[in-house]
């Protein structure tokens, strides 16, 4: 089994992005699965081109995109990606779409194929906070999650794909009072646990567990 794991470069004025820093530190193998690590740009459209090239080269069984969600307390596997680009800030090349569809011929939304409840449980079993998220936002994180699902729908039907958001690092919140953060080693630990759950649930589907939200 082969899992492609991607992490974004820094954006929005930060000099570091915990996504790529954590991805770079993942083991090369988890529960027998080969882990392929890839840095991608925080740029609409170009990020998808980079991931597509890697899918064509590596032919992975799974794709897990990792992104920073500043303000969240724990690791949050994402349930769904929506067909909208709506940038709160410009991307790293200055592009700021305001409410535009990602693909005119794409579905309104795509659900992940990953066992997100098993991922969340595995992260918590590792001693770290985790919960299911039902919105990946409308920036490049949602964009890449949607783009990979679109690729799966149109070109790569055998892959399973999803996204997980991670918190800020402590050094990112020095001037952001009352903002949660997580140590890089813990983020790596949580991602490793999530990837282990993906491998363990291969061919079995997700677990049954209470992970719903009221709002």
UniProtKB/Swiss-Prot annotation:
Its EC number is 3.4.19.3. The active site is at 78, 141, 165. The keyword Cytoplasm applies. One of its GO terms (cellular component) is cytosol. It catalyses: Release of an N-terminal pyroglutamyl group from a polypeptide, the second amino acid generally not being Pro. Keywords: Cytoplasm, Hydrolase, Protease, Thiol protease. InterPro entries: Peptidase_C15 (IPR000816), Peptidase_C15-like (IPR016125), Peptidase_C15-like_sf (IPR036440), PGP-I_bact-type (IPR029762), PGPEP1_Cys_AS (IPR033694), PGPEP1_Glu_AS (IPR033693). One of its GO terms (biological process) is proteolysis. SUPFAM superfamilies: Pyrrolidone carboxyl peptidase (pyroglutamate aminopeptidase). It holds the Pfam family Peptidase_C15. GO terms for molecular function: pyroglutamyl-peptidase activity. It is found in: Cytoplasm. Homotetramer. Removes 5-oxoproline from various penultimate amino acid residues except L-proline. Belongs to the peptidase C15 family. HAMAP family: Pyrrolid_peptidase (MF_00417). This is Pyrrolidone-carboxylate peptidase. It comes from Lactobacillus gasseri (strain ATCC 33323 / DSM 20243 / BCRC 14619 / CIP 102991 / JCM 1131 / KCTC 3163 / NCIMB 11718 / NCTC 13722 / AM63). The gene is pcp.
């Amino acid at each position: 089994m082969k899992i492609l794991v991607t992490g974004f470069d820094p954006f929005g004025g930060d000099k570091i992005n915990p996504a790529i820093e954590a991805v770079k530190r993942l083991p090369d193998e988890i529960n027998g699965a080969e882990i392929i690590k890839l840095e991608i740009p925080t740029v609409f459209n170009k990020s998808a081109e980079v991931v597509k090239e890697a899918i064509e080269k590596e032919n992975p069984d799974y794709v897990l995109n990792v992104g920073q969600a500043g303000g969240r307390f724990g690791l949050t596997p994402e349930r769904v990606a929506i067909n909208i680009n709506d940038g709160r800030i410009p991307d790293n090349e200055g592009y700021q779409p305001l409410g535009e569809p990602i693909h005119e011929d794409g579905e309104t939304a795509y659900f992940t194929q990953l066992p997100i409840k098993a991922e969340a449980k595995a992260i918590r079993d590792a001693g770290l906070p985790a919960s299911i998220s039902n919105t990946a936002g409308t920036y490049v994180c949602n964009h890449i999650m949607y783009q990979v699902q679109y690729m799966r729908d149109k070109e790569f039907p055998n892959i399973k794909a999803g996204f997980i958001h991670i918190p800020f690092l402590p050094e990112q919140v020095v001037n952001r009072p009352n903002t949660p953060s997580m140590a890089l080693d813990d983020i790596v630990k949580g991602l490793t646990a999530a990837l282990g759950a993906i491998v363990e649930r291969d061919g079995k589907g997700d677990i049954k567990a209470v992970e719903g939200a009221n709002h």
